[in-house]
Amino acid sequence: MAILVVAEHTNAALAAATLNTVAAAQAIGGDIHVLVAGSGCSAAAEAAAKIAGVTKVLVADNAAFAHQLPENVAPLIAELGAGYSHILAAATTNGKNFLPRVAAQLDVDQISEIISVESPDTFKRPIYAGNAIATVQSLSLIHI
């Protein structure tokens, strides 16, 4: 079981949110691969390689990925992600932009803004503006 973590970065540096996402991947268990898609993003890729628990870093360095536009990034993630059991990204503007597209392209459900990993297919997430916590189980082959 391998997990694809989509790195949140500024091309020059990795965002702290990526570390939180890797921690969630560690809670799931399995090999953790980090995708760094950007333009001139070698520094972010090097930082991703130094994160404890990361077994592989995939780099997509192209001008088309410079601004993390979901129209460009989502097809890349969907193509790469088809071979993974989980695809994770931080609940940031970028993650919220491209993950729904990735889920649609792979024809699987998306579980948004998890706060806890209970098992590889069961997660906790806030509902009702954070006033309640729902436990959600996914039967999809790829968990997003």
Question: Where are these predicted regions, by residue range?
Answer:
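N-terminal glycine-rich FAD/FM-binding segment characteristic of electron-transfer flavoproteins
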Residues: 1-142
